[in-house]
Structure formats: structure tokens, C-alpha cells
Amino acid sequence: MSGGSRIQLLSPRLANQIAAGEVVERPASVAKELLENSLDSGARRIDIEVEQGGVKLLKVRDDGSGISADDLPLALARHATSKIRELEDLEGVLSLGFRGEALASISSVARLTLTSRTASASEAWQVETEGRDMTPRVQPAAHPVGTSVEVRDLFFNTPARRKFLKAEKTEFDHLQEVIRRLALARFDVGFHLRHNGKSILSLHEAHDEIARARRVGAICGPGFMEQALPIDVERNGLRLWGWVGLPTFSRSQADLQYFFVNGRAVRDKLVAHAVRQAYRDVLFNGRHPTFVLFLELEPNGVDVNVHPTKHEVRFREGRSVHDFLYGTLHRALADVRPEDQLAAPAAVPELVRPTGQQAGEFGPQGEMRLASPVLEQPRAPQQSFSNGGSGAGYQYQYTPRPSQPLPAAEAQAVYREFYKPLETGAAPATALPESQGDIPPLGYALAQLKGIYILAENAVGLVLVDMHAAHERIMYERLKVAMASEGLSGQPLLVPETLALSQREADCAEEHAQWFQRLGFELQRLGPETLAIRQIPALLKQAEANRLVQDVLADLMEYGTSDRIQAHLNELLGTMACHGAVRANRRLAIPEMNALLRDMENTERSGQCNHGRPTWTQMGLDDLDKLFLRGR
């Protein structure tokens, strides 16, 4: 700043244009602000008309409560709002808008016309303003009860801003995404969109489970609903409900992720971290989960006044929210079994309402307890094939998950039976029961293909199983259970490693000393900015302890929790499971294949191997008929 410059007040027009830089980024930003105002007014139907991606025209019309003639000029003034009056109102605000900046910012960079009528008024009133003229003009108009806002020629008076706009299709795609998010947030409101005179979207009000599921399917695609798991869990004043996509319906981009807090669409790093943790064990590298989730909590438990766009929020009890989200999603994904994936997609599947440990109640990090109840399967007669023949070590029966976890050594010993050479004399094949109700979800084995795949028949048709991937997941889950039950043993270091940290990091390490100790670490503070690592988990003796502790402390300060140590341990267990699992070209007898299928049905996350690859797939009779043109 030059020495001769004097401090002076900015003109209202310039101040609004500066504010518009934060609030109005593109036509989608305008649509968001106008639609939120319509929803706050109690509208039950909103019509959106767009031309040229929203740059030439963006018109939003609703049937809400309307604005009185006396309030129309104030509606375009900065920091004028009907949503809050006192600071206490801000702490518990439930409306989508409350800052009183949107219309003033929009009118400073576009030609804006607002027409409104209340139920008690005999006629409607209209106010107009343009970017170069901030003085509003009020006049009578014809309009039903409700409000229409027409925004023309966006950024007409700021050519530099207009140059940064993308192609018409790109801008319209962003605008559509805003409408989709709000349509998911408010099932009780109808949304109707037209672009360049063509109807693009028509969503009617959805007041029941079937209608809500249809709306989600219309927005996210029918494939999502076919591969989605409904959840509804409530605990300690927090409720999470919605739909989470199965790992088999992952995406290459994070473009099908919708998260709402008290009806407000948000993008929050704490939420993203919790979801990423929950899916970490089942997603293939580089893939992203899909979900439509709604978190409900007391309004004073979340601060929405963090950013002008209100996309970011701050939770008062961030650690509790994180653990609740992670635990709920982790448990829901773990409880998915083959029969859940085989079930025909209903209009509204039964909601999953787990309780206790199934509701996401976990012990301290590193001591996660897997649920012990078993999926009840119809029991077939227990025919034993463990007669020293090719099926030695296995029994052909339903094998529920053990109520007491197996020790790691025993779990591995059992599966070493896979490596025993096959003896001559084939075991008897199993015929399918006459009643389809007696057929287990993955059916009964028919044959083995190229020593890699198991072919089985179930009530739906043909099941193909990657035996190595499936066996790998079974061993991995049993090793995790064994480790959780036996605890983590520590390995003292002959020469303790010193670690230079900031004072804040050292304080964090001291605060979480017991947490580290449960995971096999022993940390000692030597000074204000120095730690000594005296012991590490025995399984991690090859790991870089310094870097791992630093990364964990960074997570603890950012999210209040960390799963890095557990992730390292799981990686080692996964390697053990991979090397211990049955290899390709290993010939299995029919009883061995059936035993593997039964174990898959009773193993958590059996649909994916440790690396996120699918372990099995289903081909129905309809799919097979299409291959051979049957029925045409």
C-alpha cells in the first residue's frame, strides 16, 4: 500500500461484488442460494428454468410463504434476514440460509427480478435491480402465493469473472448436481427442472419409504439401489440413516457420495475420514465408496457458520461423531453376507437397525471386537467326509462363526489341510435338495475350473468363486479375531529411538500414552519437544517406528483418532493370510469346495478379498438364457 493512500469506506456496490466472490462462483452457486431460500420458505414445489447453463437465465419459482411488499427492498440488502435475531439463534439455526448475503451478492453481478405474494396479500409485488444500479425498484405484479426469482446475464458487469466460466454443458452439470443434492435432502418437496425449454428432471414429493427409495434411484441410478444397503442406527443422541453402496458398487471417482447433517449437504474432512476408514478393508485400490447418508443430531452440536457457502461444518463432539460414523458403517459392511447380495432388489429393503456391538460400539482402537452372533442358516444333515480321503480336515456342514475366537496358530493349522495331497477315490458329490428353501446362498459345488474357480449351483443359477481370494478373506478375518482376543505383545527396543516433535505433538502423545500402550507402543517424554520410543508391537518390528508415530500423532490432532497402527497390523495379517491361503492350481474335492462355500457364508466381508477384489459372482438363469438366445 502506497504511503499516500487513505482508508475509506467501500461503496455498497463494490462491497457486494467482493462478497459475491465468495458466495457466487458460477450459476450453480446462484441456484443453491435461491433453492435454499425456497426451502426455508416452506415450499412444497419448486420449478427451475435454465437457459445456457444458467448464465443467460436462471429462474426459481416456489409455492412458499412469500415476502410482504414492505420487506421486498430489505430482501436485497446485505445482512438482512428473517432467519435469526440473536446470537443464540445462530447457535441452534436449522434453516439452510441465515447470513443475509446471498440476494445482495447475486444482484450485484446480475440483473435480478424478485416477485412475491403472501397468502394475506391481495396482489403480488415485484422488485428489480441491476449490478450497476443498486437502488431497488418496487412495483405491483401478477403472481400466485409464493416467490419467483429471475437472474439474467450473470457476471454481465464483471467480464473477468465471466471469462472463468466453463462450457455451457459443464456449468449445467454443476447446476444439476446442486439440485440433486437438495432433492435428496428434502424428500417432501417436488423439484422440476427445465433447460433451454426441455424438461430434464421431474421429482414429485416422496412421503413414504417406497417413494424415497424411488427418488434415490432416480438421482443415483437404479444400479445404486440394487447394490445399496439401507441402514438406520441411533445412539447417544446421534442418528445415521440412509443407504451405503456395497463394495462391489465402488466408483473410480468420488462422484456418488452424498452426506447431510440435519438436512444440510456438507463436505467435511472428519466425515470423509470416517467413511474412508470403514471401507478401507474392502475396497480395491483407487476405488471410492458410494453412499447417501443422513446424520441427525441436536442443532447446538454442530456449527454451520464456518464458511459463506455453508458447505463446511464443525462438530462440537467431533471424536464422538467420527467414532459413531465409523463404527456404524464398519459394522453394517461387516454383516453383509452372500444372501444379502443375492436378494432381489426390492422397492424398499428391510432397514438394518443393529444394536449393541452391531450398532458400532467398539473397544479402544486395536481392540475391536467382532460380533459373535451367527447368521442362522437352515441346517442340512451333517455328513462327515473327514475319513482320511480327499476331504480330510473338513466337514460338509454349516459352520457358524465360532463364539470363541480361534488362536492364530490353530486357525492356520486348520487351513494347512488344504495342502495335503489328494488321495485317489473321489468323495461323493452332493445332490441339490428338492426344496429350494434348503439350498444355502452360495449353493453346492459342481466342479473346479482350471484349479482357480469353483463352479456352484444355487437357487438363482450359477455361482463362480475365486477360491484363493475367498480363502484369503476367511483366513484374514480369523487372524484378526485371534489377534483381538489374544492382544498385542510389545517388543522392547535395545536402543530406544528418539523422536523430535513440536510441543503440541509431544503433548498429544503424552495425553494418549495409554492408547499407545494398548497397541504395543511405549512412549516416554524426554523433554518439551522430544519423545523416546522404548517399545513397539512385535508384529511391526520391521516398520519405521518414527514415521509411524508421527503419522499417528498427526491423525490424532486432526481427527481425534487414528487407524494407522491397526492398518499396518492388518496389512501384515493380510500378507499372512495371502501366503497361507489355498493357491491356484490346487485341486479340491467336492466336499472341500462345499466347506469353503459354507465358510464364506459365515465370514464377515467375504464378498471381497483382502485387496478389495471380488471373491465371487452370480449368473442367473436369465443371464445364461440370454447367452444362448433362449426364449426368443
Curated annotation (Swiss-Prot):
Pfam families: DNA_mis_repair (PF01119), HATPase_c_3 (PF13589), MutL_C (PF08676). SMART domains: DNA_mis_repair, MutL_C. GO terms for molecular function: ATP binding; ATP hydrolysis activity; ATP-dependent DNA damage sensor activity; mismatched DNA binding. GO terms for biological process: mismatch repair. InterPro entries: DNA_mismatch_repair_CS, DNA_mismatch_repair_MutL, DNA_mismatch_S5_2-like, HATPase_C_sf, MutL/Mlh/PMS, MutL/Mlh/Pms-like, MutL_C, MutL_C_dimsub. GO terms for cellular component: mismatch repair complex. Keywords: DNA damage, DNA repair. It comes from the Bacteria. NCBIfam families: mutl (TIGR00585), PRK00095.1-2 (NF000949). Belongs to the DNA mismatch repair MutL/HexB family. This protein is involved in the repair of mismatches in DNA. It is required for dam-dependent methyl-directed DNA mismatch repair. May act as a 'molecular matchmaker', a protein that promotes the formation of a stable complex between two or more DNA-binding proteins in an ATP-dependent manner without itself being part of a final effector complex. PANTHER family: DNA MISMATCH REPAIR PROTEIN MLH, PMS, MUTL, DNA MISMATCH REPAIR PROTEIN MLH1. This is DNA mismatch repair protein MutL.
